[in-house]
Design a protein with these regions (language model features):
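Adenosine-nucleotide cofactor-binding segment
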Residues: 3-63
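Terminal peptide-recognition signature
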Residues: 24, 55, 67, 102, ...
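Glycine-centered, small-residue-biased loops immediately flanking beta-strands
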Residues: 75, 100
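Acidic carboxylate diad motif detector
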Residues: 80-81
Length: 169
């Protein structure tokens, strides 16, 4: 059940630089933990002693041990990318005894109806001001003309922070 303390928003974001910490705070993170300079597991559990509700993961093969350590009982580990490593090993007893849930999300296999509904909801949230975009909101936008598509791909491959957008109109 939702208790007053569970209703309070308390985002913890792991980052690799002070610049990314600034962007995460602009996007709404209340806490940032630099995983290159700090013991991320220790710092996250100091902020959320019972663990976090959800881990949003982009490198499951590397991070599964810490994900398991910092996710609360009945929590979720949501995976939407694979930045290295094709296999994840799950300690079965430790995982199922805490009723953890792994949720894999791949946009391309959701089905067009769900993609359309999500796009409609996101556009409505942006139009209403409920979802902010741009550097001041922690998500720098990098625009490229359609004829500069190769440069846009290169920006993504080089790890551009934020969103790389190709203008087609």
């Amino acid at each position: 059940p939702a208790t007053p303390s569970r209703l309070l928003r308390n985002e913890v974001t792991t980052i690799s630089s002070e610049e990314k910490a600034r962007l995460a705070r602009a996007a709404g993170a209340q806490h940032t933990v630099n995983y290159r300079e700090q013991d991320a597991e220790k710092e996250i559990l100091a902020i959320a002693p019972d663990g976090v509700d959800i881990v949003v993961e982009v490198a499951p093969a590397q991070n599964n041990p810490i994900d398991l350590a910092v996710t609360r009982v009945r929590g979720t580990i949501a995976i939407y990318a694979n930045n290295g490593g094709d296999e994840v090993t799950l300690p079965v007893r430790a995982t199922f005894s805490r009723n953890l849930r792994y949720q894999f999300v791949l946009l391309y296999t959701l089905g067009q109806d769900l993609v359309d509904a999500a796009a409609e909801d996101i556009n409505a949230a942006v139009a209403a001001g409920a979802l902010r975009v741009g550097e001041e909101a922690g998500v720098p936008l990098h625009h490229y003309a359609l004829e500069d598509l190769a440069a846009a791909h290169e920006a993504v491959e080089n790890g551009a922070v934020g969103k790389v957008l190709v203008d087609v109109a």
